[in-house]
C-alpha cells in the first residue's frame, strides 16, 4: 500500500487503516480554504502577469464573496484583500457563484434584501438582479462594470470540480475598463484556460 509505505496511514488491524498521527499533526492549521489558497495563488500570479491586471479567487460564504487568493500586477492595485469580503450581488465573482446556486438557494438570496446601491451602476432591484444572474449563468461569466466601485472593472468565470460542481471563481480586475469587446473576449479565453488548469490541479477527487 503506497499510502502506508509513505507513512500517511497506519494499520490498526487486518484490513483497517487509520491516518498516521504524525501526518495529522503536520496538517494542523490547514483548512480546505487554506489548501485552496496555496494551490491557486501561484496560478493567479502567472495570470496576473499575462493579463496585466489584479486577479482573484473567491468563494461564497454567508451570501458574501470571500477572497481566498489575490495576485497584484504592478500599477494595478485594487482595494480588495485576501480573506476580505465583498457583496455578491454586484461583484463579478459573486454573480458567477450566485448564478450557480440551486433555484431555491438563489430565490432565498434574492428575497433577503435590501441590496445597497454602492455606485450609480449598482443593480439593486431584486427582479433585475435575478435577470442579471440568469444572463451570467447563460453566457458563462460575470461582469462588474463599475458596480462595486466607480473605478473597478471586473470579469469572472467559474472554477468547476471534476464532478461539475462550482468550487469558486476567478476574476480579472482593473481600474481601467476593457477597451473593446475583443479585449474582453481575450481576457475570457485566458480566464477560462486558467479555471480549467485549477480544476485539473484539484484532481479527480474534487
What are these regions (language model features)?
Residues 18-112:
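Amphipathic alpha-helical effector-binding/dimerization core
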Residues 23-26, 115-116, 175-179:
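A short, flexible beta-alpha/helix-coil linker loop
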Residues 29, 118-119:
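Short hinge/gating elements
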Residues 104-109, 116-117, 139, 143:
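Short, structured loop/turn "capping" segments at alpha-beta junctions
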Residues 108, 113-114, 192-206:
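Cysteine/selenocysteine-centered motifs that mediate thiol-based redox chemistry or coordinate metal-sulfur cofactors
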Residues 121-194:
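Extended hydrophobic
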Amino acid at each position: 500500500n503506497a499510502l502506508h509505505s509513505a507513512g500517511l496511514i497506519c494499520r490498526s488491524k487486518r484490513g483497517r487503516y487509520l491516518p498516521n498521527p504524525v501526518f495529522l499533526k503536520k496538517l494542523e492549521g490547514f483548512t480546505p480554504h487554506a489548501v485552496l489558497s496555496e494551490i491557486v495563488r501561484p496560478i493567479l500570479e502567472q495570470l496576473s502577469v499575462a493579463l496585466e491586471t489584479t486577479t482573484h479567487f473567491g468563494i461564497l460564504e454567508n451570501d458574501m464573496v470571500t477572497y481566498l487568493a489575490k495576485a497584484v500586477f504592478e500599477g494595478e492595485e485594487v482595494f480588495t484583500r485576501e480573506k476580505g469580503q465583498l457583496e455578491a450581488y454586484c461583484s463579478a465573482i459573486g454573480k458567477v457563484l450566485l448564478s450557480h446556486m440551486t433555484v431555491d438557494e438563489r430565490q432565498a438570496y434574492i428575497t433577503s434584501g435590501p441590496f445597497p446601491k454602492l455606485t450609480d451602476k449598482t443593480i439593486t432591484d431584486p427582479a433585475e438582479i435575478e435577470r442579471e444572474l440568469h444572463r451570467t449563468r447563460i453566457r458563462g461569466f460575470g461582469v462588474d462594470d463599475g458596480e462595486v466601485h466607480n473605478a473597478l472593472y471586473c470579469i469572472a468565470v467559474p472554477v468547476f470540480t471534476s464532478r461539475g460542481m462550482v468550487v469558486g471563481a476567478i476574476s480579472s480586475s482593473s481600474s481601467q475598463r476593457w477597451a473593446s469587446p475583443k479585449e474582453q473576449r481575450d481576457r475570457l479565453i485566458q480566464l477560462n484556460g486558467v479555471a480549467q488548469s485549477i480544476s485539473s490541479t484539484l484532481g479527480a477527487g474534487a
